[in-house]
């Protein structure tokens, strides 16, 4: 650890890694894999003050997990249409607006009706749990609002992706994700985050190296007979059974539970995560939220 006697909020930092691995060519600036606010496609880690983001809003629901009705949403798809009735199309903040609706056009002989959208629509369906497709920083160009992605190629697991924020260049995404979760809670809805811990967007050469393969080349990924394992079909597999990888997964999930107040997690390709790690995840997160909702494919 290091102590710096000045206010570093909003400043950027990186680790300078050097070693014998040929890809470093001596040394390389690397983004902190634990960074909580990563900016831009190439990635820059911003220093934040967690205490500056205000209070959380507790879940206002007594519905038992056994009675869960889960509604899956894509952050952009649910609100990008002009008919969604929001001023925050495609953004986190779209789920913070109440009483949004689409006004039907009047047709001769038929009265024009208002059709509820977003939170109002979700509640009308009788849903009590909202599952949000991946928003952890993924492989995309945050500056391009027209770029589309599902989020299943993660890069930096503690940072929300900026493409759904009002300003991708700063920490707006942190404040806005917290507001979104608080809004769901205020409306009696559990917030579930779809997470990807079976693989990453990282490669093994050149610009494809983000953090893991820079700090400890090859350690974070599985290999079989000298080849990269690819049970995910996405290029690699995280070696969840390795102590430091398991520690990383648990600590990042705990952060999303404590800081963002998510009520549970849906695991993409859970079958690629070892059983001991999954048991530890349930144990650790249950200590934070006894009714944590954990499930996956």
Where are these regions (language model features)?
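The feature marks proteins involved in alpha-glucan
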Residues: 2-108
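Conserved alpha/beta catalytic core and glycan-binding cleft of carbohydrate-active enzymes
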Residues: 35-41, 46-48, 261, 282-297
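Active-site flanking residues adjacent to catalytic metal/cofactor-binding acidic residues
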Residues: 71, 193, 296
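Short catalytic-loop micro-motif centered on adjacent basic/acidic residues
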Residues: 192, 264-270
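Substrate-binding/catalytic cleft of secreted carbohydrate-active enzymes
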Residues: 207, 269, 296-297
């Amino acid at each position: 650890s290091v102590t710096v006697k000045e206010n570093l909020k909003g400043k950027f930092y990186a680790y300078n890694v050097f070693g014998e691995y040929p890809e470093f060519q001596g040394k390389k600036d690397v983004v902190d894999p634990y960074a909580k606010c990563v900016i831009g496609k190439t990635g820059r880690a911003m220093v934040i003050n967690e205490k500056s983001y205000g209070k959380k809003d507790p879940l206002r629901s007594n519905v038992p997990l056994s009675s869960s009705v889960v509604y899956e949403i894509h952050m952009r798809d649910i609100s990008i249409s002009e008919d969604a009735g929001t001023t925050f199309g495609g953004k986190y903040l779209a789920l913070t607006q109440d009483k949004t609706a689409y006004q039907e056009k009047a047709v001769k002989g038929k009265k024009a009706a208002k059709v509820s959208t977003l939170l109002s629509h979700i509640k009308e369906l009788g849903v009590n749990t909202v599952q949000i497709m991946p928003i952890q920083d993924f492989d995309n160009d945050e500056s391009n609002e027209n770029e589309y992605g599902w989020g299943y190629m993660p890069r930096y697991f503690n940072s929300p992706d900026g493409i759904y924020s009002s300003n991708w260049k700063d920490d707006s995404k942190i404040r806005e994700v917290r507001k979104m979760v608080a809004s769901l809670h205020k409306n009696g809805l559990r917030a579930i985050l779809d997470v990807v811990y079976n693989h990453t967007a990282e490669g093994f050469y050149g610009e494809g190296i983000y953090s893991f393969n820079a700090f400890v080349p090859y350690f974070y990924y599985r290999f079989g007979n000298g080849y990269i394992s690819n049970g995910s079909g996405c290029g690699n597999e995280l070696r969840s059974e390795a102590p430091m990888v398991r520690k990383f997964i648990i600590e990042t999930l705990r952060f999303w539970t404590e800081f963002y107040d998510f009520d549970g997690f849906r695991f993409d390709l859970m079958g690629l995560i070892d059983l001991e790690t999954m048991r530890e995840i349930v144990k650790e997160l249950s200590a934070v939220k006894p009714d944590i909702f954990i499930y996956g494919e």
